[in-house]
Amino acid sequence: MTRVRISEDALQDLNDGFLFYEAQEVGLGDYFAACLRADIERLKVSAGVHRVVYQDYRRLLSKVFPYGIFYTMEGDCGVVWAVIDLRKDPAWVREKLKE
C-alpha cells in the first residue's frame, strides 16, 4: 500500500469545495467531503497508475463530483497537491499547478 500525503493547498481546495456545495444544499457539502475522501483513499492502492497530465502531475478523477485530484509520486508516497473542479478553464488549471 502506498502512503498518501495531502498538501495544505489541497486541503484548502477541499474546504472550498465543501463550502460551495454546502451553500447549494445543506448536507451536500458533507456528501462532497465523504466522496472526495474516499477518492483520495483509493490512491493508497492505485497511486502511480494514473496518466501524467501536466509536468509530473497525475490526475485521479472523482467518481461522483466533477473534480480531479492532482498528485505526484515522491518515492513510495503519493502527494496530493490540488483538488480542482474540472469545469474550470484548462489554462487556469495549468496555472494553479504551476504555483
Segments (PLM) and residue ranges:
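Short, hydrophobic secondary-structure boundary micro-motifs
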Residues: 30-31, 51-53, 92
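Enriched for short, Lys/Arg-rich terminal
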Residues: 68, 72-99
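Basic/aromatic recognition patch in beta-strand/loop cores that engages polyanionic ligands
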Residues: 38, 42-79
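Arg/Lys-rich, positively charged N-terminal/basic patches that mediate binding to nucleic acids
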Residues: 1-33
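Active-site micro-motifs of SAM-dependent methyltransferase domains
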Residues: 12, 42, 88
